[in-house]
């Protein structure tokens, strides 16, 4: 959305010499606006790198977040610098043609950002309402189509003024004014803000209702399934697990409940994070989309230039604060941000490649005298742990209290055929899983050793994702 100045509204038909620049004001605005632009650019780049460098963030939901960051990055890197120069100088210094192009790119990026939030709200509604069916409903192909629709619709809304849908431009090329043609103002306000806002609010109201209902149901079920053991028991499903009689049905029911609990907890937390993003979006953009139509349809009620500049930059501010919201609201993004800032991205990807597909053997006395490798499973390698109640008939993993690093002592559980041990760094949640494996030759086929695909996730003590 393009800045409007008072002299623009006068519709001057001649080019006036630019007024002298107030140096102190220019320096102050340059520092503030320049810092805001740099923060927005670096923050959105950080979001993109965090998703790109962490396998567990390679999901359709996070691709939507990357799309939002791309739109915000384009806005902060291609539009805001010229807006800041316009604000500092007090006049447009780049000519009429570039003014029109700049205005179109401005509307394109802002609309794409807003519609991206709309797509995210729909995605979160599906994730919370249908957590188990979500992967089949929201596929990568459908996600790509949704993102294409976002950018096509944004392009349609933004290019109207380039084809003449605007009021006559002033002859003074130092004036780059907002398009106040009433028809276009109504069209762009509805398409860029009010329709997406209505969808967002409806989706999050439904998310809230579903989350409250599901939370009550899952909490009541969790109370009946809690174990008396103080140890955290995590199990990994594997095929061809023997079971007897009616225990199969009971195990399936408990497994379904536990998987549903974890998936719902994960979707609920993502919905909370993105709900904060949407709340900030409404606070930032609503004033602008109230002021703009009022000024277009009712010129007598047009706000002052100072008020307009405030709401104008408040809308831009939204594209700079989303990178703050993610780490503050999500441990997942906080860890990803920290890894990128510490330049651990490449090392984590390489470690992940070695960890995935590793064949784990249960600890046994036969392995005691052999060389062992400690396999580091990095958090965020793209896998999932399920916390499931006892007697499920599935492969069991027990995680014990923290042990000093470098300790060679290995705790061997009683049931060596069904579980193996690991160490965790934190008592409250899983940060790093170090599993005991063997570098010895692969056992013979008649040796009953399960080959397990490793699945990891960060879990709280109650089973929720952290």
Curated annotation (Swiss-Prot):
PTM note:
C-terminal Ser or Thr residues may be phosphorylated.
Q: What is its main location?
A: nucleus
Q: Where are the transmembrane segments?
A: 28-51, 65-88, 100-122, 144-167, 182-205, 274-297, 306-329
Residues that carry a glycan: 7, 13, 22
Q: Quick check: keyword Cytoplasm in the entry?
A: yes
A GO biological process of this protein is:
negative regulation of Rho protein signal transduction
- Where are residues bearing Phosphoserine located in the sequence? 215
Q: Which UniProt keywords apply?
A: Cell membrane, Cytoplasm, Disulfide bond, G-protein coupled receptor, Glycoprotein, Lipoprotein, Membrane, Nucleus, Palmitate, Phosphoprotein, Receptor, Transducer, Transmembrane, Transmembrane helix
Compartment(s): Nucleus membrane; Cell membrane; Cytoplasm; Membrane, Caveola
Lipid positions (S-palmitoyl cysteine): 345
- By its UniProt entry, which SUPFAM superfamilies does this protein fall under? Family A G protein-coupled receptor-like (SSF81321)
Among InterPro entries, the record links this protein to:
ADR_fam, ADRA1A_rcpt, GPCR_Rhodpsn, GPCR_Rhodpsn_7TM
Intervals, Cytoplasmic compartment: 52-64, 123-143, 206-273, 330-466
Q: Which cysteines are joined by disulfide bonds?
A: 99-176
Span of the annotated motif Nuclear localization signal: 334-349
Q: Which GO terms describe its molecular function?
A: alpha1-adrenergic receptor activity; protein heterodimerization activity
| Functional summary from the UniProt entry | This alpha-adrenergic receptor mediates its action by association with G proteins that activate a phosphatidylinositol-calcium second messenger system. Its effect is mediated by G(q) and G(11) proteins. Nuclear ADRA1A-ADRA1B heterooligomers regulate phenylephrine (PE)-stimulated ERK signaling in cardiac myocytes.
The record's family statement is: Belongs to the G-protein coupled receptor 1 family. Adrenergic receptor subfamily. ADRA1A sub-subfamily.
Note the subunit structure. Answer: Homo- and heterooligomer. Heterooligomerizes with ADRA1B homooligomers in cardiac myocytes. Interacts with CAVIN4.
Q: Which PANTHER family match?
A: ADRENERGIC RECEPTOR-RELATED G-PROTEIN COUPLED RECEPTOR, ALPHA-1A ADRENERGIC RECEPTOR
Protein name, as recorded: Alpha-1A adrenergic receptor
């Amino acid at each position: 959305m393009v800045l409007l100045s008072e002299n623009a509204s006068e519709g001057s038909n001649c080019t006036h010499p630019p007024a002298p620049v107030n140096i102190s004001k220019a320096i102050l605005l340059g520092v503030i606006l320049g810092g805001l632009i740099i923060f927005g650019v670096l923050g959105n780049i950080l979001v993109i790198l965090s998703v790109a460098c962490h396998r567990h963030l390679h999901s359709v939901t996070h691709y939507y977040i990357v799309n939002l960051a791309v739109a915000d990055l384009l806005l902060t890197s291609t539009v805001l610098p010229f807006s800041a120069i316009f604000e500092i100088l007090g006049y447009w210094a780049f000519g009429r043609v570039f003014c029109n192009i700049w205005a179109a790119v401005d509307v394109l990026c802002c609309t794409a950002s807003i519609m991206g939030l709309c797509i995210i709200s729909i995605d979160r509604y599906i994730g919370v309402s249908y957590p188990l069916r979500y992967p089949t409903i929201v596929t990568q192909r459908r996600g790509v189509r949704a993102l294409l629709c976002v950018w096509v619709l944004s392009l349609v809304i933004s290019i109207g003024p380039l084809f003449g849908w605007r009021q006559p431009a002033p002859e003074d090329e130092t004036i780059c004014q907002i398009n106040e043609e009433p028809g276009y103002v109504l069209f762009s306000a509805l398409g860029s803000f009010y329709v997406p806002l209505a969808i967002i609010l409806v989706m999050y109201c439904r998310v809230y209702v579903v989350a409250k209902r599901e939370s009550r149901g899952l909490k009541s079920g969790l109370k009946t399934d809690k174990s008396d053991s103080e140890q955290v028991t995590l199990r990994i499903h594997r095929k061809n697990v023997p079971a007897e009689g009616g225990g199969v049905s009971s195990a399936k029911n408990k497994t379904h409940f536990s998987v549903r609990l974890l998936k719902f907890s994960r979707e609920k937390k993502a919905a909370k994070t993105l709900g904060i993003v949407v709340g900030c979006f409404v606070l930032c953009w609503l004033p602008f989309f109230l002021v703009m139509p009022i000024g277009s349809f009712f010129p007598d009620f047009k706000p002052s230039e100072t008020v307009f500049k405030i709401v104008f930059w408040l809308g831009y501010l939204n594209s700079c604060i989303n990178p703050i919201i993610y780490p503050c609201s999500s441990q997942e993004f906080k860890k990803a941000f920290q890894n990128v800032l510490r330049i651990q991205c490449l090392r984590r990807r390489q470690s992940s490649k070695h960890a995935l597909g590793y064949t784990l053997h249960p600890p046994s006395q036969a392995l005691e005298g052999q060389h062992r490798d400690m396999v580091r499973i990095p958090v965020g390698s793209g896998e999932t742990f399920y916390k499931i109640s006892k007697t499920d008939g599935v492969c069991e993993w027990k995680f014990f209290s923290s042990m000093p690093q470098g300790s060679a002592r290995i705790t061997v559980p009683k049931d060596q055929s069904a579980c193996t041990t690991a160490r965790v760094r934190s008592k409250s949640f899983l940060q790093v899983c170090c599993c005991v494996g063997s570098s010895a030759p692969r056992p013979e086929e008649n040796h009953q050793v399960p080959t397990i695909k490793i699945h990891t996730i960060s879990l709280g003590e109650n089973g929720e994702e952290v």
